[in-house]
Amino acid sequence: MNTILEKLYQSEVLTQVESQQLFTAIITGQLAPTQLAAALIAMKVRGETPQEIAGAATALLADAKPFPRPDYPFADIVGTGGDGSNSINISTSSAFVAAACGVKVAKHGNRSVSSQSGSSDLLAAFGISLDLPAEQARQALDELNVCFLFAPQYHSGFRHAMPVRKELKTRTIFNVLGPLINPARPPLAVIGVYSPQLVLPIAETLKMLGYQRAAVVHGGGMDEVALHSATQVAELRDGEITRYQLTPDDFGLSSHPQEALAGGSPEENRDILTRLLQGKGQLAHEEAVAANVALLLKMFGHEDLRDNAQRALATIRSGKAWQHVAALAERG
């Protein structure tokens, strides 16, 4: 371990295996707080590489509580959070709409990073249990096309890093790991990142982690597909990464100002998104979710983004997505 730490102090890059060893030590409580702080800051100042991020994610997945992984295609749609936008929960809403469109989503999430309401804050406000046993969550994925996996339930090792992370008060590699450590190990994903500089490195990380198809996105300061600005995309497909931009026109949707997506407390977000998922939402909210669902449907092989967006809008306006929220809430 001292050799690995010394490499970091010399601004050298760790291999994927070394990073995995380091993070295995971190999540099993083997590092002193000063060592942990030094390692995290050394990586941050130099800039974390895809192999270091992949090694860390591999360590966390190996330590995670097991989830009975399905053999059918399923996805996650998730953002790093921390974009500072304090917007409504686009990815959480998109998961329910995608489920109502007929694809399966195992959403991995946590409490808020920078907004007043993270994905699990919202789900709790909907009355959805955050601690369903893994078998019951898998059953919900089978029968309702959607389940939610609450990060702390599966990743107990995070607790060893929490005090240091809180004291450092700055972003570290842990801020990008959340979307990469879904214990269900989905082969497909749409992952939003808080900085355009992370789009390509996270796509390269997903390749190392063995994802079949995934899109990493950043849209005008937000960790999702945006309608107020062009969205930067790095798409991984069968081991190849393609970079491109998406505009509202690519989805056949209108442009909307970022302020139109402003969120509030979990209760306020619940009320806004209840109306949206019941088919009574605001146009800006409907179209923002439709754009994100459209890209997610592409990961399942539905290649036409305009068709996908129209399908998502029709689903939103039918109120079918709300049935999935209500059915999941009934399970505990």
Swiss-Prot record:
Pfam hit, one: Glycos_trans_3N
Keywords: Amino-acid biosynthesis, Aromatic amino acid biosynthesis, Glycosyltransferase, Magnesium, Metal-binding, Transferase, Tryptophan biosynthesis
Cofactor binding note: Binds 2 magnesium ions per monomer.
Chain positions recorded as Mg(2+) 2 binding sites: D223, E224
Binding site for anthranilate 2: R165
Binding residues annotated for 5-phospho-alpha-D-ribose 1-diphosphate, in chain numbering: 79, 82-83, 87, 89-92, 107-115, 119
GO cellular component, one term: cytosol
One GO-annotated biological process of the protein: L-tryptophan biosynthetic process
Function description: Catalyzes the transfer of the phosphoribosyl group of 5-phosphorylribose-1-pyrophosphate (PRPP) to anthranilate to yield N-(5'-phosphoribosyl)-anthranilate (PRA).
Family classification: Belongs to the anthranilate phosphoribosyltransferase family.
UniProt-listed PANTHER family: ANTHRANILATE PHOSPHORIBOSYLTRANSFERASE
Name this protein carries in UniProt: Anthranilate phosphoribosyltransferase
Lineage: Bacteria, Pseudomonadati, Pseudomonadota, Gammaproteobacteria, Enterobacterales
